[in-house]
């Protein structure tokens, strides 16, 4: 008989204690984030160190179904180790700030222990790939002087490494973590609150009422609802799981295959992170890194996001026509009741408030706080189910869990950032990237895109974006790319990694709901979302698409015409067989690349091919041949 079987009361007591501690830490994290958003940061060390500390304690006390004694003891040991490291940090924080303290062996030991805990929590929260990248970075810092050649550095001892990574704001507690604690958590709370209030269901109903009458209307409605709610939720997988349970079966019932239904939801949910005004979490970190106001970043993201979702709508329309899916009867579409319109205010009013406050110069955190207050007030007034203590607890714990995951992910990225700054690795990578691309902007962009896709396959958008932009961003900007274009380029490919095989996390999430092959869904999602892979190249070569940098009306209009034609070719040609699909893909790629005469030639060929296809389809092609003879 095992120990849990002999002492069930002990494990029951431990489970209840974990639940109580988890709820306590969740309340502290949410309350602290709201307080900081409302009143500002009065102690930077307390906010950063305390925020990460609460986040890790949340993950360590998260309720678990395991009854393995070893796992419980491990969590207890990690908790004790991390608390000891935090206590030690607080004891020497003031002396460290003024440079009046030199680390002693116990500081180094506790610093190493704290990093071990951070990496283990990152492994549990976001997976092994990010941890492996961090371990490679630490190994490079300690032993990189023996590599020789371009990658060699002057050497880093353990004291200097711990001082940078743990006992300063240059590593784990760097600026990205401050942005998460000070701003991003507020918007995570906002998104979780909207979900708890039922805003997602009302948005889907509104989308179905507005677009459901179209051919393939259920799929169109799913795209619109996922775009709107995905911008707030900030997670492709969470959005697929949250809205997909309703939208995917709904799309299948109208005549689409499970594979196509899952692909539509996966591609639409992934795009939520590039849809203004909230864009998940990455826009806030981008604003901090670039110094560009958050509202300007939202404006820059607008046209590319509309092009992306426009291509999804076009692909759905073509597929619906190919399958002979008829328009549904408008009378059968769900009607928006008076209560639905009132509940819609819990989404529209707070979102409008955020935009209005940002335009008036308010900080994103303050705008998010006010939006939460308004959404909560409206929700409690209009939704009786939201007034229960259980509903509030679910919202708080959900927001805290999501926040804890992004906290440890960004903290782990801080290890990589700290090593890069300490060793000069970033400059070496930039030089290597320039040498590899031989000064070619296109090659540099392709290398950066591939790196984003590979890193993004195993980690969330934010850490993938941070690592790539810090490593390769300077090299691309050195080739004349505007800062905002370089950052947006990385974000797009980090987002697209969620549907890119072989990992394709959003595709796997949709597969279980659609009852279809995960790989099949991912391949179809990539086909639907091809504009998501092409638009980044377009706004690098035509920065006017971003509206806020080097704007030229002629370039903007010509770029829109070319991208509109690319959407048309990708969608229409894909429904005519493999050769047409390949031709459409090649044509779309050539329309994105620079070269005026090349672009005009591609457009002319596309129009000619379409005209010949229609003539042949109508039977008049043969008549023309006979007349010419």
Predicted region positions:
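Conserved, well-structured core domains of diverse proteins
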Residues: 1-98, 108-112, 626
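Membrane-interfacial loop-to-helix junctions in multi-pass transporters
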Residues: 104-109, 171-183, 209-223, 254-260, ...
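Long, contiguous bundles of hydrophobic transmembrane helices that form the permeation core
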Residues: 2-19, 299-402, 505-591
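Membrane-interface helix termini and inter-helical loops of multi-pass transporters
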Residues: 39-40, 93-100, 162-163, 420-436, ...
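Hydrophobic or amphipathic alpha-helical targeting/insertion segments
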Residues: 73-84, 90-95, 108-167
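Transmembrane alpha-helix interface/packing and boundary motifs in multi-pass membrane proteins
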Residues: 191-195, 226-235, 267-273, 358, ...
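Hydrophobic transmembrane alpha-helices that form the pore/transport pathway of multi-pass ion
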Residues: 204-272, 282-285, 291, 461-492, ...
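Core transmembrane alpha-helical segments of multi-pass membrane transporters/permeases
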Residues: 120, 125, 135-150, 158-159, ...
């Amino acid at each position: 008989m095992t120990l849990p079987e002999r002492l069930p009361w002990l494990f029951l007591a431990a489970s209840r204690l974990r639940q109580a501690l988890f709820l306590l830490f969740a309340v502290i994290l949410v309350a602290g984030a709201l307080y900081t958003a409302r009143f500002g940061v009065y102690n930077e060390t307390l906010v950063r160190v305390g925020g990460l500390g609460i986040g890790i304690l949340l993950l360590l006390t998260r309720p678990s179904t395991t009854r393995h004694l070893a796992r419980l003891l491990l969590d207890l040991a990690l908790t004790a180790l991390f608390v000891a490291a935090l206590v030690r940090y607080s004891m020497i924080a003031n002396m460290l700030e003024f440079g009046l303290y030199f680390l002693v062996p116990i500081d180094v030991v506790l610093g190493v222990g704290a990093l071990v805990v951070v990496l283990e929590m990152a492994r549990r929260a976001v997976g092994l790939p990010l941890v492996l990248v961090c371990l490679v970075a630490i190994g490079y810092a300690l032993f990189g002087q023996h590599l020789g050649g371009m990658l060699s550095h002057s050497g880093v001892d353990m004291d200097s490494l711990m001082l940078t990574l743990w006992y300063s704001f240059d590593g784990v507690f760097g600026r990205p973590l401050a942005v998460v604690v000070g701003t991003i958590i507020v918007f995570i709370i906002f998104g979780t609150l909207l979900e708890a209030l039922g805003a997602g269901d009302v948005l889907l109903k509104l989308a179905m009422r507005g677009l459901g009458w179209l051919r393939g209307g259920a799929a169109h409605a799913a795209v619109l609802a996922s775009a709107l709610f995905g911008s707030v939720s900030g997670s492709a997988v969470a959005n697929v799981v949250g809205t997909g349970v309703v939208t995917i079966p709904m799309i299948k019932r109208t005549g689409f295959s499970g594979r196509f239904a899952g692909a539509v939801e996966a591609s639409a949910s992934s795009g939520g992170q590039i849809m203004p005004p909230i864009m998940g979490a990455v826009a806030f970190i981008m604003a901090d890194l670039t110094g560009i106001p958050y509202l300007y970043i939202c404006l820059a993201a607008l046209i590319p996001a509309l092009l992306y979702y426009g291509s999804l709508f076009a692909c759905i329309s073509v597929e619906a026509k190919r399958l002979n899916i008829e328009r549904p009867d408008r009378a059968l579409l769900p009607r928006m009741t008076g209560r639905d319109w009132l509940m819609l205010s819990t989404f529209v009013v707070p979102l409008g408030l955020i935009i209005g406050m940002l335009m008036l110069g308010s900080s994103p955190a303050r705008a998010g706080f006010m939006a939460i207050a308004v959404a909560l007030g409206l929700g409690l007034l209009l939704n009786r189910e939201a007034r229960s203590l259980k509903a509030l607890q679910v919202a708080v714990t959900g927001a805290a869990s999501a926040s804890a995951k992004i906290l440890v992910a960004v903290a782990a990225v801080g290890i990589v950032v700290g090593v890069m700054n300490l060793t000069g690795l970033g400059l070496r990578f930039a030089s290597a990237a320039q040498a590899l691309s031989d000064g070619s902007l296109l090659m540099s962009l392709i290398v950066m895109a591939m790196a984003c896709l590979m890193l993004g396959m195993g980690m969330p958008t934010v850490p993938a974006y941070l690592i790539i932009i810090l490593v390769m961003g300077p090299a691309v900007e050195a080739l004349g790319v505007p800062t905002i274009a370089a950052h947006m380029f990385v974000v797009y490919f980090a987002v697209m990694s969620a549907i890119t095989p072989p990992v394709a996390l959003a595709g796997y999430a949709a597969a279980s709901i659609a009852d279809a092959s995960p790989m099949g869904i991912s391949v179809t999602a990539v086909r639907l979302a091809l504009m998501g892979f092409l638009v980044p190249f377009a706004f690098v070569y035509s920065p006017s698409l971003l509206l806020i940098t080097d704007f030229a009306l002629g370039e903007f209009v010509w770029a829109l015409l070319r991208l509109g034609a690319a959407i048309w070719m990708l969608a229409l040609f894909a429904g005519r067989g493999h050769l047409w699909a390949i031709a459409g893909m090649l044509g779309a790629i050539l329309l994105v690349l620079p070269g005026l005469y090349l672009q005009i030639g591609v457009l002319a060929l596309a129009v000619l091919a379409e005209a010949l296809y229609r003539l042949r389809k109508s039977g008049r092609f043969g008549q023309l041949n006979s007349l010419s003879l």
